[in-house]
């Protein structure tokens, strides 16, 4: 199967698994854990609330489906990288697709202006600390919820009035960090706590040599920069000081495989660190 069709199939699978009107994952896990039929929306899965309460000790007070799903998500990220983001999440895929509608000269390369990782993890830290001041952000700027609303409107004609925070979120997600961002995944890079939490455990797994990861064969790499140009997360760079060789940043790599597909000499692969040539 051609690579682009594989990616599309993965995101369609994610849509069927997690979003209305199907939500097969929530239905199956909900029935397994509680023997009840869960509402088929992204709310019953919510990965953001358990992450928000991971520091204050209230993580297990919420829906068992939500808590178990979050634990599964982080374990998968530790072992295999942020595969949910890179291969299943249709909310991220939508803005990546939208960005292709705008010529490159009109798009912002955020890496050219700032380091992504400090902002990414800083937002995650703030997100997890908010409960200590009796606040909650999980539902305030949720692009998953917005995607669910778009799907409900398209399939059922159902919509709700949006709060000012959700209107701002939609503008940032779809326009600023979507249409006019290189790769279309600016929201994923800077504002998504689910992606940042996965990246944190993935980066730890990479440093321990445990996680499967995208890796560069230094003997094959010719420093052409095609991977850096293609990467939707701007996680791939070519460092002149490193003999013009590509480097992949585990702090925001989502193991989507775009870099490997774009490499003309097949210098990038996915596997355990000890498999690196």
Where are these regions (language model features)?
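Non-ligating segments of multi-cofactor redox enzymes
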Residues: 1-242, 246, 251-254, 258-277
């Amino acid at each position: 199967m051609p690579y682009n069709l594989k990616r599309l199939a993965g995101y369609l699978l994610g849509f069927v698994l997690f979003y209305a009107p199907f939500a097969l994952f929530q239905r199956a896990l909900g029935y397994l854990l509680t023997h009840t039929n869960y509402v088929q929306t992204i709310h019953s899965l919510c990965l953001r609330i358990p992450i928000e309460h991971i520091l204050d000790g209230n993580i297990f007070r919420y829906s068992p489906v939500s808590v178990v799903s979050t634990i599964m998500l982080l374990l998968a990220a530790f072992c295999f990288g942020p595969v949910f983001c890179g291969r299943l999440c249709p909310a991220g895929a939508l803005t990546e697709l939208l960005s292709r509608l705008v010529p490159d000269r009109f798009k912002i390369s955020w890496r050219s202006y700032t380091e992504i990782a400090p902002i990414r993890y800083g937002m995650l830290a703030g997100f997890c600390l908010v409960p200590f001041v009796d606040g909650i952000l999980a539902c305030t700027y949720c692009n998953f919820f917005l995607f669910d609303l778009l799907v409900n409107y398209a399939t059922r004609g159902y919509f709700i009035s949006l709060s000012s925070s959700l209107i701002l979120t939609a503008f940032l997600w779809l326009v600023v960090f979507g249409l006019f961002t290189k790769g279309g995944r600016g929201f994923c890079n800077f504002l998504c706590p689910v992606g940042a939490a996965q990246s944190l455990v993935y980066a730890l797994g990479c440093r321990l040599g445990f996680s499967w990861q995208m890796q560069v064969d230094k003997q094959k790499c010719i420093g052409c920069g095609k991977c850096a140009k293609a990467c939707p997360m701007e996680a791939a760079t070519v460092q002149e000081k490193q003999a013009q060789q590509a480097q992949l940043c585990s702090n925001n790599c989502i193991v989507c495989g775009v870099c490997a597909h774009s490499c003309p000499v097949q210098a990038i692969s996915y596997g355990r660190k000890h498999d690196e040539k």
